Structures are given as structure tokens and as C-alpha cells.
Amino acid sequence: MMLSHWVLLLSLGAVWLAEGGEISPGSCTFENSTCAYTSAFPFLQWTVNIEGHYVSVDSSNGLRGQKAVLISPDLHLAEWSCLRLVYQIAGSESSPSPSSLNVFVRPEGESFDYLLWSAEEHSDSWLISSIDLKNTTKRFKIILEGVLGENTMSSIAIFEVKMTTGYCIECDFEENHLCGYMNSWNPNVNWFVGGGNVKNSHSILPRDHTLNNELGHYMYVDSVYVKHFQEVAQLVSPLIITPISGCLSFYYQLQRETSNIFLVHTRDLHGSYDEIWKMGAVRQGEWNLAEVDLNAHVPLEVIFEVAFNGIQAGYVALDDILFSPVSCSGQEGMFFDAREAGCDFEEGMCQFHQDDNNGSGWSRVKVKPNAYQMGDHTTGLGYFMIANTRFTGQPAYFGRLYGPSLPGNIQYCIRFFYSLYGFYKTIDSLAVYIFEENHVVQEKIWSAHETPKGVWLQAEISIHKPMPFKVVFVSWCKSLWDCGIAALDDISVSIGSCKISDRIPPLPGKCTFEKNDCGFEQEWQRRGIWHRIQGRTPTFYTGPNGDHTSGVGYYMYIEATNMVFGQKAKLISRPLRAVAGKQCLTFYYHMYGAGTGLLNVYLTKEGDINKDTLLWTRKGEQSITWLKAQMEYESEQQHKIVFEAVRGISIRSDIAIDDILFQNGPCNDSSDPLQSSGYSDNFNNIEF
């Protein structure tokens, strides 16, 4: 599962029944039809079961990799809503290519669908998943996509889709689906549904809080089933996928205060727990209100946990879980915008500064790329930070670059690009320290070791500190012969562990070529071929030393030694939906080599096969570094984007592209820093 989480195992009879009256937009019980959902051509058809109740697709209808797609009608959310899906995926669990079920959102006027949720886990029972949807002024559609695996017995079924107003974490436990809450299984002690004239407890249970009568429902856990000291029962919420910040409130009741422990934790995708609430002194036999601030910056679950000291500890009951975007203190729930803590140094040093007592060990520069030095990582021709040059590097000299203060008790992921080069040693010439503002001592958390020169490498560090702190980038010039040059660019800060953020779905229009070719196709007949490669190209004095994404990843390039002068290679995007208004295309290209030919970008509209529109072109050697290209185009027809590379006069004609990004709307900065071959004179002259 892309965003793995606990799900509630349901038998078919335990799944909630649609309430009488009108079904809310986006909901469907699949009794005798797919409601307002429609199947998308030319994909497989979802089949309504002959007895109703669900739709399905299986291996008898199609082959491995084939899709069945259901598209909702146009939807509009004036309020925050929750989409709940009851589904089942059947087949062999050992299959190397299992079936999957995906949920996308398709915003009006955009070419791409955004992945909200995905599952591959097989089950003999129905499962339930909950997905938070932000309120929006833009219309959208929900896309349900089933992808068949290679097993001959593969099948995917959807029992019900239900759209309700409110947050998925909220619950009054009055419906059979229990809002997706489930037990973290314990063979002895578990949470049960109470109320509704249910008589399955040895204790005398209370009325519920919602209705205040015997017909209402709530969750409870009873100590009578305890077999071991402080045995734990956990009730786990649906996974919170969409970031929220505010006040979580709930009502609870207990029979004996001194004989049990009641806690609330959060748990992220990495399995890390964080206690956010603990029961104090309360009135027994009454419903008590609890409130706690909840900041779900990354996907996480909320866990209600009870530990009993013995079988005579009574019960703990839980009801009416609510969430408000206003903090419990009454202030609007505020996110710390981690993006503001980063910097690409294009417009200045952002919130970074140097230690005035030590002088300026770091310099913000823009250099002219040549065979010995690269441009910056952001655009290839922009600004970056550099240390240990002839003018800043002195024996036994430290240069410290301080970042902004970051609030404590939050998990962060720090990413940045660095490059070490020069003719001197580079080991330990760049390090990262943590400076806690209430401590004098700095803690070293990362250092650069001997790395390939002539390439920007990405580093990432996960940090969690209880108190506010600053990240410090330290350059060290040990001696005249051990003073490697250190460069730094594109520092970014995000909430959550770096491992967790890697599991969050990427932007749908983004392709880094790290895993595959992103659906790009090639023209094979009498054409050259684009190759997906990692590292440097085989021919010297042409091509990049590494990719643009991380420095050690993949990119696409043409190998000039396998082509003849003037031969072309075309890389063609998958069909893109027609949308009104401007679209923005961004990518990075590398054209280095004395014999470099041409790189062209075309727009091909459906039905206009012979009328390609040239959007952008470059001819000849451009730079030893990756350069950024950005352009706008419009197409109210289905279309494709074509990258065409033309081999130059010699084998030193490798051309590469990487990090392609399609975005809706005009480009934020549509100006291309390099309008033709050659450079401007607005560069710093740096001696190394």
C-alpha cells in the first residue's frame, strides 16, 4: 500500500447500509447500477453484480496491467468532507505483480489526476478506507481505478463509496462502519461497541453521550478480559492523509480512575509514537470532555490506548470524537510553513546568515560554467553559496552558515545539494551541525566524504529536537593542502521524516526517471534511441557526470556514438488532456560537447499529426552543467509533448534531459535565462 494504514475488516453483512432518502453527490451503494459514475473508454468495464451490492472486475475480463476506471460526476465541496470506500482485492498474496485499487482526484481544468490513496493488500473480507477531501471552489471528479495483477484469479470489488461532510477522524459510532476505527488486535482485551441494547459486557455500562439514551452507541473496553498486568487495548483511527491542524476533542467515561491508564498517541508511517494526551483526575461515572491540540503535518493515525492493572479495573468508554481547525486555546490552527526555512539563493540569502565574529567564510556567487566548474543547481546560471575559495579559505578556518530558527518537538527533513571540487583534499570540508539556542555546544549530524567531483549531490537528514534549533552548514579549511572547495544550493525543509516524505505520492505531472520512463514512448523506425542511464555517459568530454535530481539517479540521453550526423531521436509523452488556458512545461537539459547538435520541443495536437508546433529549441554546446528550460503553451485538444534530439557532427554530441514537470496555469517565471548559445557577462570570477 502506498500509504499503508490499519483498515477495518468487515463481513459483508456488517458494512453500513445506505440511509433512506437522497444519496449525497459522489456516493454510491451499487445496488443495481453505478449511480452517476461512468466507465471510461477504452478501459475495462466495471460489472455490477447480478444480485447488486457491489461492482467488480476480474482476470476473466482482462489481462495483467489492464485497468478498469470509474469516473464520478462533477463534484463541488463547500465544506471539508470525508470519502469512505469499502473494497476488496482478491488473488495470490505472493504474486510479484499484485492487483491494486487507486483513488484519484481530477481538478477541473488540469491535465493530470492526483493520487489520493492506493492499496494492494489482499483480503478475504471487505476493507474500509477513509480519505479526507479539502473544501475547494474548483469543481473536480473522483476517479476509481482498478489495475489487474498477473494472478489468474485476480479480482477487485467496490461495495460502496460514501461522501460525508466533516473530517474522517470524527465519529459518534452510530453507524456500523465505525468511521474506519479498528482494534490493534489483542487476543484478550479489545474495544467493543456499546449501547444500542447490546448486552455483551459483565459491567454496568452507561448511556451514550451522543443521544443520551440506551439506543445510542459508543466504544468501550472492559477490564474483565485482562489476562496480564497492564494489558493494553488500542483503538486506531483512520490514517490522516491530508494535513490538518487544530483541536481534537472527545468524551470519555471510566468506572475506576485509579486502576487504569488512558492515553492518546499519534503514530506515523514509520511507526514512531508520540503521546499527546494522558488522563488526569476526573469524575467517575460521568462523561468527561477532553481536548488536545493535534498537528498532523504528515500522514499519521490517532490511537486511543487503555492499560488495566487488573480484572477489577472496570471499564473505559469513548464517544463523540470531533475535530476543529481552531486550536483548543481558541486560536486558528497554524502550520509552521517549513518551506520558508529553505533557500535557493536566487534572490538573496533568505533567512540564512553568517557568524559576524568569524567573517565571511561563505560567499553568494554566480559563476560562468566551464570545463572545471559548474553553474548552480537551481537553473544552471543562477546563484549558490561557496566556501574555501582562494579569497575565503584560510588554514584552520571555519565558515559557518546559519539557517533560521526551527520550532522544537517537530520532525523535520532537511534536504540540500552540495558539490566538492578543486585540486585539494575535500574530505570533511563540509559538515552540518545542530545549534540549540539554549546550548553553547553544537552537535555534528552530517559530513561530506570523498565524493565524485563535477556533480551536484543531494543529501537529506531527518532531525527531531525537543527545543528550537538552527541548522548550521560548516566549511572547514584544515590547511593549505587540505582545503577542498565546498558549494551549497537549494536547501529545503519539510515536516516529517525523510523516509516518510519519500512515500508520499509525487506530483502527477512530474518525471525524474528514477523508477521508469514515466510512460514516455519512442519512435523506433529509422530513429535514434533515448537511453535511461545512471552516472556519466560512456564518451569523454560530452554528456553529464550525473543526473539533476540527486546526482546519483537516472536521466534520459542520446548516445551519439550509435547515431550518424543528423539522425533524430524522439521521446513522446503520453496523451495529455485538453484544457483551456496556459500550461507550463519545465525541464532540465544538458548539452555539452564540441559536436553537439540540436534539442527541440514540439507540441503535437490530436488530429494534427503533420502540424507539430515548435515550442523551444537549442543548438550546439550550451554548458557543462544542467540548465533549466521553462515555457508556456496552450492546447484545447488532446495533445502530446515531443522531445527531439538531433545528433551533431561528432561523437561528442550526447544530449540529456531530466526532471520534466507539467503544471496547470502560466509559469511563475517564464523567462529563459539562456536565450541562445553563449552567456551574459553578469558572472562572478572566482579563483579556485
Swiss-Prot record:
CDD domains tied to this protein: MAM
Q: What induces it?
A: By thyroid hormone.
Q: Which residues form a coiled coil?
A: none
Glycosylated residues are N32, N135, N358, N668
Q: Which UniProt keywords apply?
A: Developmental protein, Glycoprotein, Membrane, Repeat, Secreted, Signal
**How does the record classify its membrane topology?**
Peripheral membrane protein
Keyword check for Ribosomal protein = no
Q: GO cellular component annotations, sorted alphabetically?
A: extracellular region; membrane
Domain named MAM: residues: 26-169, 170-330, 341-500, 509-669
Q: Where in the cell is it found?
A: Membrane; Secreted, Extracellular space
Protein name as it appears in the record: Thyroid hormone-induced protein B
From what organism does this protein derive?
Answer: Xenopus laevis
